[in-house]
Swiss-Prot record:
Entry keywords, A to Z: Transposable element
Protein name (database record): Protein ORFg in retron Ec67
Domain of life, per lineage: Bacteria
Length: 105
């Protein structure tokens, strides 16, 4: 039975306990080993920063494995609020016929 939590979304998370605690998940790296068997559990690393400003070079960054991430989410009662303003979500863009990118809502 796979007890690894689902892969987190990129974007802003807010604590239900302390609404001033806001973090931004900036990246999720899925680790795929060459010798992995189909029965192996999914492993990933969650990269996040304190606050919402991904362009803030002074923001402290963190990296958590799935177990650490789930413990953090549960202890702080983090809930996903929205995608980051600075983040690029390729699912919302498609190549336009004439002018590069076009946005889909």
């Amino acid at each position: 039975m796979n007890n690894i939590p689902p892969i987190p979304q990129l974007g802003i998370y807010v604590s239900k306990i302390d609404p001033t605690l806001r973090i931004t998940v900036t990246d999720v790296d899925i680790v795929d080993g060459e010798d992995d068997s189909p029965d192996d559990e999914l492993f990933y690393l969650v990269h996040w920063i304190e606050g919402e400003d991904e362009s803030d070079m002074t923001a402290m960054g963190f990296e958590l494995d799935p177990v650490e991430w789930q413990a953090f989410v549960e202890s702080e009662q983090l809930v996903f609020e929205r995608e980051s303003v600075h983040g690029f979500n390729p699912r919302k863009f498609k190549l336009g016929k004439d002018s590069g990118f076009s946005h889909e809502d």
